[in-house]
Amino acid sequence: MSMLGNIKTYAQTVTSLSDNDDTSIDRLNYVVTTSILIAFSLLLFAKNYVGEPMQCWTPNQFAGGWESFAESYCFIENTYFVPMQDSNLPAAETREGREMIYYQWVPFLLVIQALFFCVPRAFWIIYPSYSGLTIADMITAARQNGKQLEGADEALEQVAMINWRTEQQKGHGSRIFNCYLVMKLLILLNIVLQFFLLNSFLNTAYTFWGWGIFWDMVNGRHWQESGHFPRVSFCDINVRELGNIHHWSLQCVLMVNMFNEKIFIFLWFWFAFLLVATAGDFVIWVWRRFDSNSKLGFILDLLNQEGIDHSPQKASELYKNVLRDDGVLFLRLLDSNSGRLNSEELMKKIYNISVGHATDLNTPIEEHATSE
């Protein structure tokens, strides 16, 4: 399969990763952002390796295939920028310091960035499975069975109780919630890493690169002066002909840099938006993890149904004896992805289990199902 085919397959796989066991902010990172990066990568792959990313002005001596050879050579071996106001080319020993070494590698960088955005998601998928909990499967079961009349009670009881008591017996009531926070922290750290990666890759003098380039454009300081993503550059090429070596300095048009500039400016501001949104989301979930009033308040909201004891004492009892932090996380994710009706229905099942089998809470759910 071709490289483009592999990238397309990868993009399709990434966009199907979501199992509704996270939040919309999480999906903005590993689904939306990854899809954007893959789309830009495909665009630049097509421009660089199918179209004509560079065209060079060549002397009359370059007949036949020499022009194509020169353009391919210059694209591979880098070019260097000379401001338009400089009438002479720089000295040969200083040209290497002016070289642009990024434009050939931009599509590959975008793929690497997309992979980085998938790492936190992979951690969230893999790690909880080792403890016997699969949040995605439980939420899917609750959503599907919540729409059915036959067998809904049994399925929801299974979803409500499976592994929560096992975790309590091991003394771990917060393992999955902690794992979820680690995943969010990894997302946040990845976004910060993206800024350093862009600055290093593009070799820019600006700390806040995207804002600096944008401000230059607003103030009329374009690439001819700043040297950022220049459309015109120079390339030195040596040609051996009849035993002699001829040195040529060619002027080339880097059409692909017009795309690179717009893509990277967009990505910088997109990453800035993600940083703010993800940081805010992380703070909210840390508060939900460690603030007792937040946990009990959420449980009370779900208990506020007819025929159910929705006293603070009952909410505290359900939290300590049945749900713990992992159970609250599951209910919050179900509430976020499936709506309040499903989460209230599931809480009602949990309440009925705790009331009807209050002396049997330590019995595994399989034994409880058998005794029925």
Swiss-Prot record:
The chain crosses the membrane at residues 31-51, 106-126, 181-201, 263-283. It is found in: Cell membrane; Cell junction, Gap junction. It is a multi-pass membrane protein. It comes from the Eukaryota. GO terms for cellular component: gap junction; plasma membrane. Belongs to the pannexin family. Keywords: Cell junction, Cell membrane, Gap junction, Glycoprotein, Ion channel, Ion transport, Membrane, Transmembrane, Transmembrane helix, Transport. This is Innexin-16. One of its GO terms (biological process) is calcium-mediated signaling. GO terms for molecular function: gap junction channel activity; gap junction hemi-channel activity. The keyword Transport applies. Glycans are attached at N352. PROSITE patterns: PANNEXIN. Structural component of the gap junctions. Required for signals downstream of defecation clock. Its main location: membrane.
